[in-house]
Every structure is written in structure tokens, then in C-alpha cells.
Amino acid sequence: MAKIDLSNFDKIIVLDFGSQYNQLITRRIRDFGIYSELLPHTITAEEVKKIAPKGIIFSGGPNSVYDENALDVDPEIFELGIPILGICYGMQLMTQKLGGTVEKAGEAEYGSAHIEVKEADSPLYKGLPEKQVVWMSHGDLVTKVPEGFEVLASSKNCPIASMADPDRKFYAVQFHAEVRNSEYGLDILRRFAFDVCGAKDNWTMDDFIKLSVDSIREEVGNANVILGISGGVDSSVTATLLHKAIGSQLTAIFVDHGLLRKNESDEVMAALKEGLGVNIVRVDAKDRFMSKLAGVTDPEKKRKIIGNEFVQVFNDEAKKIKDAKFLAQGTLYTDVIESGTDTAHTIKSHHNVGGLPEDMQFKLIEPLRQLFKDEVRVLGEKLGLPHDLVWRQPFPGPGLAIRVIGEITEEKLRIVRDADAILREEVKNAGLQESIWQYFVALPGMRSVGVMGDGRTYDYAVCIRAVTSIDGMTADFAQIPWDVLQKISVRIVNEVKQVNRVLYDVTSKPPATIEYE
């Protein structure tokens, strides 16, 4: 699917030099209502001119500018007359390219640091406190600014923590303004975007919907489109947007593998088919999946079986649809970034629709490929999807198969479903559902001795996993109030048969992962 026309939106582009925060910079700019894209550092000045951005941000990165394979930038970009903000490595690269000096720091700075703003009237710091806490992560530093630059701020270990050439509108910060640990970082980014670049906040979801609908209609014409529905947010929003654009030309195939949460299959059908009129074919493949998974305990084998079987079921149904020329996917902008290449003609190799046979010739259509996850949720609500569906918990592709440790049985799935439903209900009752990144129940496969009534029991223990996070890359266990945990525990052992013990996982990520398998 061709990109929608974004020529009417003001844009700020972010050049990728390998920082773990690259996507975060792009998201921050979009949060201001300004369209932003993450582009490779190899982009040429001519290519930048065609994009016509209001500003450019050089991201951070793990390299030194003096490394043999240091990531570089086209020097002609500095001659375009476009404002530039360098962050961390981006500041050092700007310094080196423009004639300043970068040296190895005598003492590296990692973590919180205090800076003192020396030029309070600079557009980057105007109206902000002169002393600020920022987040540093660097082993090199600028020791001499290029000609025409002035020092804007300094820290104890970094005399040049920020600099600028106001005439050319080149600005730089050694700290990571994009992370929340920098207390005024977002204000600095906002000042660069609006005050320095003069960008307008004209990136709206309503405009995106209109442009997407027009683009889909133009590309699809009278052809039919098929889409695999997993029950998750991305595929549900994709289905809703496509339905708005082409109506009955879309057929969504919902493979019900029997591994979803309690009532989830029915909720998806109610929201999309009954609520919005999306044409969905529901395939009951529970027995087929359970038969293939019988006796399997290795988590990777479980994943592969589920992925392969999903594709086979999807293929069988797809062949029944006449005149289908397009295959739709819920690819997000994060997928595009992580692939490192243009994926417009590549089918994602995940369990939903990956691995299609070569004789099934489809053109790929990815209406969400320019959106981040949080933007997809906003889009879903704009399109009329229920709030609970749009904001539902992240859920792994293999479903409950990787929350049941070891062999999967109907009995174990029932235990996890029922216990998880109680957890979700009580978290919602306590008003905690949007302050916890992810929460679920897993069945670790252990039994323990207990006493219920006057008798001894030897039943399963279930484990509650609840974490707080910003992006899922790192996570801390959620500090759920004890009275809420107690209520959840009491309900589970009383209402879920064959459970006599409830455990709470207090491990962070790292060293643990969020899921168990």
C-alpha cells in the first residue's frame, strides 16, 4: 500500500543514529500534533529537500564519532537552511561536522545529572528554570563548540551540555530530552518544534482517517480484501478502517483457536460484526489446535505449532473468497522501523498471516503502517470501537498457550481463563486498569498442599503477573494495594476449581521477561 499523502502536514524528521530512544523522539513530536518520521541517517540532502520538513532531529547513538565505522550524515544537510536539533551523539556529530572538537570524557555520565542554563533567553530554554535535572548517557563530550556557536548549558562533568548557533537555527543537547527523566525535556522539544522550527500542530487523527479511506478506495478499486483477525487491537482497528473504506469488499477471517481469554471470541464478534457490520468469517478451530498441541511442553514448539496451524486454517478459508486481490495486515510503524527496510511488499512472518503459499498472489495493504500503538488506540476510538476492546491488555499471539507452562489441556485453560477473568474484573473495580501496563494470570504447572473445609487438597497454584512500564522494554512489578490482592486471591481460591494457592510475581524486567514462555 502506498503511503498516504502527507504533503499538507508540517513535518519534523528524526535521523536514526542507533539510539534506543529513537522511536520515543518520533512519538514525542507526534504527541505535539506534528507529524514525524524516523529516517535512516544515510538520507541525502536532496531526499530531505523533497520531504520539506520544518525541522530535523539527529538522534543519539551508541557509537563515538571517532569510531572507524561511526554513523555519518550528508554534510549538505547543514546547507539546507532547515533547523536542526542534535541529541547526545547527534550533538557530537554536529560538532565534528561543523569544525568543533569532541573528546573522550574523563568521567562518563550515565543517569541523572544537574545542568545550569547559561543563556536563559535562548528559544530552547526561555521560561524554563535555570537549574534542571536531565538524563545523561555518554562517554564522549564536546570540548570546543564550532564557530558561530554559543554554550547554552553545562553540568558538573559536562561543561558544554547544550549549544546553539541561533543564526542558522542549529541547536544541540548532550542529554536525552526525549525521556521523562529529563524534567523539562518535553518542554525543550516543544520549544524546538514550535518556536525554532515554526511547525504547526496540524497532524490530527480525523485527517488521517479521511486520507486513509481515500487512499484505500483508490488502490483497491472494486477488488476484494482479506484480513486475518486475531482478536487483538491492531487487527480489529485495521478491520474497522478497511470496512469504513470499502464495506463488503472486506472479508475478515477470525481463526478461533480456543486460546483466547474468557468470552474474548464473542466480544470480538459482537464489536466488529454485530456492532459495526464488518463481514467476518469465524472459524472454530479449537479441536484442531488442541489435537496438534497434545503432549507438547516445549514453549518454542508450542509457538511453531500454533503459528503453522493458524496459517493453514487461514489459507483454507482464504481460498474460498473469490476475486480477493489484497491481503491486509495490522503492521504498525514500529514494525516498519524495526525491519530497517521498506516492508510494503513483504508479508510479516508472524503467526497471523505469515508463511502464505507462493501460489496465493496478493498485494499487501497495511493501513496502519504509519501509526504507533498509542495512535492506533486513538484511531480505534475515533472509528467507534468499544473502549474496552481498544484499550485491552497486550496479548501474545499464541494466546494462553504460553501462560500455561508445560502441556496444554482443556482443564488448565479453564483454570487460567477463570482466574484471569477475576483478576481483570477486580483490577477494573479498583480503578487500576489504566495505571498498570499489563496484568494476567499464569499457570506455572505446580501443585501444592492446602486445606479447604475439613479436608486436605493437592491442587494448582496460579501466579499473578502485573507490571508497570512505558514501552514494554523494561518493566517493574506493579505495587497493587494489598487489600486488592487479598480480594483477588480470596475470589480465585473460592471460585476457581482446583486452585488452592495464589502467588504474586515481584520480579522486574530484566532479569525476567513479562511473559513466562
Swiss-Prot record:
Keyword Ligase listed? The answer is yes
Which positions does UniProt annotate for ATP binding?
A: 230-236
Cysteine pairings via disulfide bonds: none
Q: Where is the active site?
A: 88, 176, 178
Which reactions are catalysed by this chain?
XMP + L-glutamine + ATP + H2O = GMP + L-glutamate + AMP + diphosphate + 2 H(+)
The protein's enzyme class: ligase
Keywords of this entry: ATP-binding, Glutamine amidotransferase, GMP biosynthesis, Ligase, Nucleotide-binding, Purine biosynthesis
Q: Name one GO cellular component term.
A: cytosol
Tell me which Pfam families the record gives: GATase (PF00117), GMP_synt_C (PF00958), NAD_synthase (PF02540)
InterPro entries reported in the protein's UniProt record: Class_I_gatase-like, GATASE, GMP_synth_C, GMP_synth_GATase, GMP_synthase, GMPS_ATP_PPase_dom, NAD/GMP_synthase, Rossmann-like_a/b/a_fold
Domain Glutamine amidotransferase type-1, by residue range, is 11-202
The protein's annotated pathway: Purine metabolism; GMP biosynthesis; GMP from XMP (L-Gln route): step 1/1
Domain spans labelled GMPS ATP-PPase: 203-392
The EC number(s) given in the record are: 6.3.5.2
User: One MF term in GO for this entry?
Assistant: ATP binding
Its biological purpose is as follows: Catalyzes the synthesis of GMP from XMP.
How does this protein assemble? Homodimer.
Q: What is this protein called?
A: GMP synthase [glutamine-hydrolyzing]
Q: Give the organism the record lists.
A: Lactobacillus delbrueckii subsp. bulgaricus (strain ATCC 11842 / DSM 20081 / BCRC 10696 / JCM 1002 / NBRC 13953 / NCIMB 11778 / NCTC 12712 / WDCM 00102 / Lb 14)
